[in-house]
Amino acid sequence: MANVQSRYNHLFPSPAAAFSGMYTGGLWTNNLGSWPGKANQTVEFSNGTKMTVETTASVMLDRGLDFSSGESLFQTACMPNKKSRPPDPRPSLAVGKPPYSIPLGGPSMYPDPIIHHKKDFVRGYYLHEERLEDVAVLQLPTFRLIGESPVSLARVAVQFLERARKDGKEKLIIDLSNNMGGDINLGFNLFRILFPDKPIYTATRFPSTELIGLMGRVFSTSQGNEAVEHDNTLDLPLVFQNAVTPDHRHSFGSWEKLFGPVEIAGQNMSHLHATYNFTTASTEDNPISGYGGIEFGPSTQLFHAENIIIMTNGICASTCTILARLLKQQGVRSIVFGGRPRAAPMQLLGGSKGGQYWSLVTISHYIKKAREIAVNASGAGSPILSEDELARFLELAPPPLTGFPIRIDSRGGSGVNFRNEYDEKDPTTPLQFVYEAADCRLFWTAENYVFPESSWVAAADAMFGDASCVEESDGHHITP
């Protein structure tokens, strides 16, 4: 999480986390391998009683801690040998029984939905309070669809929204709490389902470094294009033929027209371009309604923007932030729950607002592939790079991850933000560095934890009724 308020929420239990397979107990009880700073923690309750909890560690290596010395442990865990297997960056939960019960989560904590996806990736509800009988809730806890088609999720969302309107619901809460992202086409498609006549604007830049400049030249050739077409692991923004302007009206005539560089805050960056070409990316299996000749969902807008609110607990990243920002650009209001116990604004989106994440594995793979193409082309007598340029490429390019003297993350658990995302009104400041407070903030209550649906009632009362937000928290949002 990128901001302190969301990190604070991440410490505590979240019933919504279970829908995406995340740990429901909060990082305070399981810090995923990070030392919390103390051998024990003391919690004091409001009635004055105290409880001390000891910090314990668990081992995620396949063979456990069956090592005779520190050297043997180092050889197994740190050295790049084929016989040993590195720990998974997303390990299973701690082995053994903790001296406490892990909080429940997922469907068992929520009321029965009106309609839901078979794996609960989408759930729809109605509020039953008399004053809120016109409010529907669309819960989207994840876009990470392992083994599921994006169409199946989008179809359930459409069915619920159309049924809600048929049943007289005029207001909609979109609950994105604990949504850490996933399939990006799905996020774009959901936006178009809600606003079918609104175009999607996305703007990104990548750093125009010398190495990226050479890689782009390699991948933009016929040899590079052929390699990309035959390798489905290459998902590159470095092929100028695939890039389009943010409004999708123009393409780039050459690599140089995409690469730039443009100097921004002393850094060389590329020209603005869309996340990708929606027309070519929209398919029957993973559609973006209105693009690529595919229509999905209602042809007219079902809910007015002023009657829609986005709700999060700040734990929203990747595709979640993209969907939320697109909705905000249409005038949809937002509410956030939790954070530190002080009267102040809180950001709606606490996760990454970058344009594209590249793992170290991805970076290594792309560099390796560019190196192969460039070297083979020179060897075949049809060089892409001059002799000096190829020598410079080989000088700049790091070795494969397996070529480092100690093991470097080889499972995609580490990486960097490769592309920055920008707002249409500010093409120079990355969104990652833009403070965007929610329109309203509420603190969690004990009832919200025990009965999560009560948070929807509180959100509806604050945004559609006369209930108050946390003092000093409203009126600080950035107008779309």
From Swiss-Prot:
Gene Ontology biological process? proteolysis
Q: What class of enzyme is it?
A: hydrolase
Q: What UniProt keywords apply to this chain's record, in alphabetical order?
A: Hydrolase, Protease, Serine protease
State the phenotype upon gene disruption.
Impairs the production of ustiloxin B and its intermediate ustiloxin F.
Report the GO molecular function annotations: serine-type peptidase activity
Q: Which SUPFAM superfamilies match?
A: ClpP/crotonase (SSF52096)
Which parts of the sequence are annotated with region: Peptidase S41 domain?
A: 134-336
InterPro entries of this UniProt entry? ClpP/crotonase-like_dom_sf, PDZ_CPAF-rel, S41A_metabolite_peptidase, Tail-specific_protease
Q: Which pathway does the record list?
A: Mycotoxin biosynthesis
- Keyword Hydrolase applies: yes
Q: Where is this region: Disordered?
A: 78-97
What the protein does?
A: Peptidase S41 family protein; part of the gene cluster that mediates the biosynthesis of the secondary metabolite ustiloxin B, an antimitotic tetrapeptide. First, ustA is processed by the subtilisin-like endoprotease Kex2 that is outside the ustiloxin B gene cluster, at the C-terminal side of Arg-Lys, after transfer to Golgi apparatus through the endoplasmic reticulum (ER). Cleavage by KEX2 generates 16 peptides YAIG-I to YAIG-XVI.
Say which family it is in: Belongs to the peptidase S41A family.
| Name of the protein | Peptidase S41 family protein ustP
